[in-house]
Curated annotation (Swiss-Prot):
UniProt xrefs under HAMAP family: Malate_dehydrog_3
Function as written in the Swiss-Prot or TrEMBL entry: Catalyzes the reversible oxidation of malate to oxaloacetate.
Name of protein: Malate dehydrogenase
EC number(s) stated in the UniProt entry for this protein: 1.1.1.37
Species per Swiss-Prot/TrEMBL record: Anaplasma marginale (strain Florida)
Gene this protein is translated from: mdh
Record carries keyword Nucleotide-binding: no
Length: 317
């Protein structure tokens, strides 16, 4: 992969997340070139102009282009996929699965054609099933396909916990495993505040289990809460920031440990599925799956999450 000074990143899907991510990457100058691709070509070109002009004010020379032609993603170092449709009223879970699976399949085939050496970060929901689709239809190696979910879920958990304890969020380190949904598993033993495990804070009386249970539940419903408040949209700043965090570790070979939807081949007792687990992200993509010992209770919740993902994958026709 090229260095961050010459790295090219393509964003497939120029909606709110794609636009916010383009601005973040351009402002931080983590990459040299950005490409936005979307079926709505005119909208994409307008967003390119808007973001590009914002970057001019910031003194950023990141080169940004866009349109509807997939050929523009050729020779990308990384491709972020946000394209897809949200679940609409009257649409079944299976409808959403198969509609977005078709979208992801088309994107996967174009990535295989134009950028087979890229790292692909999938954001499209239902997340874990869509990452599996990308892997299946692109033919890319497993270490080059990953889903963004755990970074976002962990950020939400950290935010809520920091607010509750009235401390800097920089003092909080959280780890969330499992699928991107109601069965995500925040690991309290591996989550810390000021280096002190949350479990120890509970035992010392600084936190109580009722408060933590409420924070966990709010984290699980974090996306839904934002949708209800916005009424006409969904979260995009935090998902974009989560993608930027992953991309920085990849482009700069930082080898940061973060929870992502990654391919499991026996780790955590799971095979041939993409599930949210801690991984090391470096210049080769997913360089290692980090296995944390789980208690029987944690393993049970994790297994439920895995079965839900397996059911989603099986439902794709």
């Amino acid at each position: 992969m090229r260095s961050s000074r010459s790295a090219k990143v393509s964003l497939v899907g120029a909606g709110n997340i794609g636009g916010a991510l383009a601005h973040m990457l351009g402002a931080s100058q983590v990459v040299k070139e950005l490409v936005l691709v979307d079926v709505a070509g005119g909208m994409t070109e307008g967003k390119v102009l808007d973001v590009g002009q914002a970057l001019a004010l910031l003194g950023s020379d990141v080169y940004i282009t866009g349109g509807s032609d997939y050929a523009a993603i050729e020779h990308s170092d990384a491709v972020v996929v946000t394209a897809g449709i949200p679940r609409k009223e009257g649409m079944s879970r299976e409808d959403l699965l198969n509609t977005n699976a078709a979208v992801v399949r088309n994107i996967a085939e174009n990535i295989a054609k134009y950028s087979p050496g890229a790292l692909v970060i999938v954001v499209t929901n239902p997340l874990d099933a869509m990452v599996w689709c990308m892997y299946k239809y692109s033919g890319l190696p497993a270490n080059r396909v990953v889903g963004m979910a755990g970074v976002l879920d962990s950020a939400r958990f950290s935010f809520f916990l920091a607010r509750h304890m009235n401390v800097s969020v920089s003092s909080v380190s959280a780890m969330v495993l499992g699928g991107h949904g109601d069965l995500m598993l925040p690991l309290l033993r591996y989550s810390t505040v000021g280096g002190v495990p949350v479990e120890s804070l509970i035992e010392s009386g600084r936190l109580n289990r009722g408060d933590i249970a409420a924070i966990v539940e709010r984290t699980r419903k974090g996306g839904e809460e934002i949708v209800k408040l916005l009424k006409t949209g969904s979260a995009y700043c935090a998902p974009a920031a989560s993608c930027a965090h992953m991309l920085e570790s990849y482009v700069r070979d930082k080898r940061s440990i973060m929870p992502c939807s990654a391919y499991l081949d026996g780790q955590y007792g799971v095979r041939d599925l993409f599930v949210g687990v801690p991984v090391i992200i470096g210049e080769k993509g997913v360089e290692e799956v980090v296995e944390f010992p789980l208690t029987a209770e944690e393993q049970a919740v994790f297994d439920q999450s895995v079965e839900l993902i397996r059911g989603s994958v099986s439902a794709i026709s």
